UniProtKB/Swiss-Prot annotation:
Protein name stated in the entry: Thiamine-phosphate synthase
Function of the protein: Condenses 4-methyl-5-(beta-hydroxyethyl)thiazole monophosphate (THZ-P) and 2-methyl-4-amino-5-hydroxymethyl pyrimidine pyrophosphate (HMP-PP) to form thiamine monophosphate (TMP).
InterPro entries for this protein: Aldolase_TIM, ThiamineP_synth_sf, ThiamineP_synth_TenI, TMP_synthase
Catalytic reaction equation(s): 2-[(2R,5Z)-2-carboxy-4-methylthiazol-5(2H)-ylidene]ethyl phosphate + 4-amino-2-methyl-5-(diphosphooxymethyl)pyrimidine + 2 H(+) = thiamine phosphate + CO2 + diphosphate; 2-(2-carboxy-4-methylthiazol-5-yl)ethyl phosphate + 4-amino-2-methyl-5-(diphosphooxymethyl)pyrimidine + 2 H(+) = thiamine phosphate + CO2 + diphosphate; 4-methyl-5-(2-phosphooxyethyl)-thiazole + 4-amino-2-methyl-5-(diphosphooxymethyl)pyrimidine + H(+) = thiamine phosphate + diphosphate
Amino acids binding 2-[(2R,5Z)-2-carboxy-4-methylthiazol-5(2H)-ylidene]ethyl phosphate: 136-138, 168, 188-189
Pathway: Cofactor biosynthesis; thiamine diphosphate biosynthesis; thiamine phosphate from 4-amino-2-methyl-5-diphosphomethylpyrimidine and 4-methyl-5-(2-phosphoethyl)-thiazole: step 1/1
Annotated organism of origin: Streptococcus agalactiae serotype V (strain ATCC BAA-611 / 2603 V/R)
Keywords: Magnesium, Metal-binding, Thiamine biosynthesis, Transferase
Cofactor note: Binds 1 Mg(2+) ion per subunit.
Disulphide connectivity of cysteines: none
EC nos: 2.5.1.3
SUPFAM superfamilies xref list: Thiamin phosphate synthase
Family: Belongs to the thiamine-phosphate synthase family.
Pfam families: TMP-TENI (PF02581)
Length: 223
């Protein structure tokens, strides 16, 4: 799972002002994202049959590139189209209920603070998304930025759980994020609003891979 989190692209139709979401996602897939989440929220978000139809089209794209297709906070849609997994927040469906309904799917959980981490039923989730790293405008209900604090604190007590950092992340922050213990980064605007999506995605993937190699070298020296 940790390798799958290297470059996690989160996107919905409201995040794509320059191009159609299908074009954006396919370019990101071509350039090296390792996981995709369909997060369809906001005042102009698709609903009902339109949302289902879009999810199916995005799912087909992801299958073509062998990238897992995750849906945000809509377990019914996950079940309906047999998506690869579900991502939920602290105030969404309880994770134990999600696992009961999706025994063989990927389940991710958002965590912001150590208090949330300690109260979460982590035995039934496949990864946690920690953030927001920086202040972000992509989520109207975003919590205060936590930087690397929570990631570092979690890594000190849990070396095994897969962690992806999210929230206002650009390539400039990748090294510090990976160094703090995250296995990858999740981004919205860094890809969806980029002038050149392929170039931006490749740069992010390059920075993640480089940071992971450097962290491993540092770990080997310490050993």
């Amino acid at each position: 799972m940790k390798d799958t989190l290297k470059l996690y692209f989160v996107c919905g139709t409201v995040d794509c002002s320059r191009k159609n979401i299908l074009t954006v996602v396919e370019e990101a897939l071509q350039a090296g994202i390792t996981l995709f989440q369909f997060r369809e929220k906001g005042f102009t978000a698709l609903q009902g049959k339109e949302k289902i139809a879009m999810a199916k089209q995005l799912q087909i794209l992801c299958k073509q590139y062998q990238v897992p297709f995750i849906i945000d906070d809509d377990i019914d849609l996950v079940e309906l189209i047999d998506a690869d997994g579900l991502h939920i927040g602290q105030n969404d469906l309880p994770v134990d209920e999600a696992r009961r309904r999706l025994p063989d799917k990927i389940i991710g959980l958002s965590v912001s603070t150590m208090d949330e981490y300690q109260k979460s039923q982590l035995s039934v989730v496949d990864y946690i998304g920690i953030g927001p790293f920086n202040p972000t405008q992509s989520k109207a209900d975003a919590k205060p930025a936590v930087g690397n604090r929570t990631t570092k604190a979690v890594r000190e007590i849990n070396q095994d759980i897969p962690i992806v950092a999210i929230g206002g992340i650009t390539s400039d922050f990748v090294h510090d994020i990976i160094e703090s213990g995250a296995d990858g980064i999740a981004v919205i605007s860094a890809i969806s609003k980029a002038n050149h999506i392929v170039d931006a995605t490749r740069q992010l993937r390059y920075e993640v891979e480089k940071a992971l190699v450097n962290r491993q070298k540092h770990s080997d020296v310490i050993k």
